[in-house]
Amino acid sequence: MKLAYWMYAGPAHIGTLRVASSFKNVHAIMHAPLGDDYFNVMRSMLERERDFTPVTTSIVDRHVLARGSQEKVVENITRKDNEESPDLIILTPTCTSSILQEDLQNFVNRASMSENSTSDVLLADVNHYRVNELQAADRTLEQIVRFYLEKEKSTLFRQGVSSVDDNNKTLTNNFLSIKTEKPSANIIGIFTLGFHNQHDCRELKRLLNNLGIEINEVIPEGGSVKNLKNLPKAWFNIIPYREVGLMSAIYLEKEFNMPYVAVSPIGIIDTAVCIREIERILNKIYFESLEGNVNTQSVLTTNPYFNSHINSTNSETRDHNVKPFDFEFYIENQTRFISQAAWFSRSIDCQNLTGKKAVVFGDATHAAGITKILAREMGIKVVCSGTYCKHDADWFREQVFGFCDQILITDDHTQVGDMIAKLEPSAIFGTQMERHIGKRLDIPCGVISAPVHIQNFPLSYRPFLGYEGTNQIADLVYNSFSLGMEDHLLEIFSGHDTKEPITKSLSTENELNWDAEALKELSNVPGFVRGKVKRNTEKYARQNAIPSITLDVLFAAKEALSA
């Protein structure tokens, strides 16, 4: 445990509460002392929603410590059950209340046995000392999905549907896995307080609709736990973000043989890779259905991208080089004519950014995606790419290998700040903390990942996924870099940007003072190198133990650097 005034990923109970509050008609009860109950305020402040946050705090106070928590927790669960009749009540401790080592599962069992209980009650199965917010969210979502699918299996078993087949798999699984008539997909991992998640969900729906694929379920955001039994009916699952949803997809693949797409469609190239992965899955399902003597052709021929030349059901006479589903025309059309990003990356405006240095830091999905866009699609030199998702470090290294000079895996914002100060990039792409660091160093920053503040929960449509997302990212990248002659024009025409240069040290210790003459001389230095001159002068002053920078010190530093 460590004391910090900034955390990229919060404690585990925040992840559980984010998942619980994303579902409809699900209530969370947090067993915690005062001070751990800030989630309601945080979500109400950031998310632009009309509904109240469905979280109640069962406060651990001195009375609870004296008498025990069981009576109070059970009473709170029963009260919320009677007042709001939610479909599910989730009980979660926090890292603080976990110290009490109470048997919360026993509390849940007691509350579930109440005669008047109409809600399911579930204890979040999360180790609060070993996992962070994102890992806990992923685990909680998988736990809820597993709970309701196992519950549906039990219901079917009691109805006499279940038995055991030759492969030692229950026929209940097969019964649950009856697919939708037309190709369909589940979108897993869209949830509250995510980075542009609602906009990304709309863009994914539009993308799938263009491919003739229906949406089966979207979870957890806006989903109902009563509909979780329908998850196996989809043909495949889409996991737009690795951080949340991957465990659920792996469970569904293992139990119901459901394939999943875990390629995040961020950027022109990865969007095409994602679509081709969907194409591969649909073609595989089609051929398997033919071998199983299931006639799906009458349904699939209505898909706009179904190849009508596939007319043989005989595997011996069928041409295996011809794909039933072929999305290449859609990819080419979107890339060349619909998305503006591919054209913009070859324009003279974007070519002006070629070779400029950038630092990228964020969650694993967004940081890896933006790194590849900058390096592959826009010709920008990524001098450092990093993530705070230390649990996914191996995947991240594999993704960004060859696209950046250095890789930084840390959840300590001071290390990130020191790296940025050392590398002196032209722009930063990161979280809210990197925006603060950029302001202190006078380096522009584009926000590409959570955690973020209110301005990155926009009312307007701003996805980061899919082809519209590529346009948004291209705008963000271009607008994050300082324009060529902007500083000079503002100075020549006495523009509004006349603030004096600020100290660019991330530490408040040993700050140097500039006298008026030195500052005046510094202001005469061209804007695009002024920051570098200032940093070199301060470095020279510190090396020589000079507390105040005068005109003589400025010139001495210049001579020392030139020598």
Swiss-Prot record:
GO BP annotations listed: light-independent chlorophyll biosynthetic process; photosynthesis, dark reaction
Reaction(s) catalysed (UniProt annotation): chlorophyllide a + oxidized 2[4Fe-4S]-[ferredoxin] + 2 ADP + 2 phosphate = protochlorophyllide a + reduced 2[4Fe-4S]-[ferredoxin] + 2 ATP + 2 H2O
Binding site for substrate: G484, M485
GO CC terms in record: chloroplast
InterPro entries (alphabetical): ChlB/BchB/BchZ, LI-POR_suB-like_C, Nase/OxRdtase_comp1, P-CP_red_C, Protochl_reductB, Protochlorophyllide_Rdtase
Record key words, sorted: 4Fe-4S, ATP-binding, Chlorophyll biosynthesis, Chloroplast, Iron, Iron-sulfur, Metal-binding, Nucleotide-binding, Oxidoreductase, Photosynthesis, Plastid
Summary of subunit composition and partner proteins: Protochlorophyllide reductase is composed of three subunits; ChlL, ChlN and ChlB. Forms a heterotetramer of two ChlB and two ChlN subunits.
Protein name: Light-independent protochlorophyllide reductase subunit B
Organism of provenance: Chlamydomonas moewusii (Chlamydomonas eugametos)
Name of the gene this protein is made from: chlB
